């Protein structure tokens, strides 16, 4: 089983990042990977907090030249296209993101930027998700959110939207 913690838009507010990591470890178990979808603040601090391999993409408020605008991540038998999303106009549409994922032979696309959680699972196409924001939520209930993705031994994927408590 591969367990991946997915978050976005922490904007350097790492107290909720720490809480999310601790919650997952206590309630579900250890994570093997962390994916941060941009507007991270200090990437090195996040990597230190996680203690597992981290894949971090550049958001529209990140200025670390080492961060990529998009990254293709291999996880189990899946390929994940990870990006912040602002360069793909995700606040208005998702087709550009979907096309970018397809061009990179990915079956999962992840983005941030909107601060609103989203999950569209399509086994015949691409699963698209946004974990929302761990520090500045914009959905109706204004709760801090993140996602946990699990890939089992048969490469079946499950997603869970979780709240920082």
PLM-predicted stretches and their roles:
Residues 1-51, 63-64, 68-69, 141-145, ...:
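N-terminal active-site segment of His-dependent metallophosphoesterases
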Residues 11-15, 40-44, 61-67, 88-92, ...:
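Active-site environment of divalent metal-dependent phosphoester hydrolases
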Residues 6-8, 33-39, 55-60, 81-84, ...:
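Active-site neighborhood of phospho(di)ester-bond hydrolases with catalytic His/Asp-centered motifs
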Residues 52, 120-135:
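Short acidic, glycine/proline-enriched helix-loop-strand junctions
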Residues 2, 32, 52, 78, ...:
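A structural micro-motif
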Residues 12, 18-19, 76, 99-105, ...:
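Binuclear metal-dependent phosphoesterase catalytic core
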Residues 53-99, 103-104:
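Helix-adjacent hinge/juxtasegments
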């Amino acid at each position: 089983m591969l367990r991946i913690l997915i978050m976005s838009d922490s904007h350097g507010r790492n107290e909720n990042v720490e809480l999310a990591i601790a919650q997952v470890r206590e309630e579900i178990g250890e994570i093997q990977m962390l994916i941060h979808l941009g507007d991270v603040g200090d990437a090195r601090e996040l990597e230190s907090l996680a203690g597992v391999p981290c894949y971090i993409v550049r958001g529209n408020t990140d200025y670390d030249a080492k961060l990529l605008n998009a990254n293709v991540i291999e996880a189990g038998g899946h390929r994940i296209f990870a990006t912040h999303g602002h360069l793909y106009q995700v606040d208005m549409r998702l087709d550009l993101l979907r096309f970018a994922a397809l061009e990179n032979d990915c079956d999962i696309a992840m983005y941030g930027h909107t601060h609103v959680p989203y999950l569209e699972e399509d086994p015949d196409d691409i699963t698209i998700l946004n974990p929302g924001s761990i520090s500045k939520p914009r959905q109706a209930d204004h709760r801090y959110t993140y996602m946990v993705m699990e890939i089992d031994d048969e490469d079946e994927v499950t997603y869970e939207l979780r709240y920082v408590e």
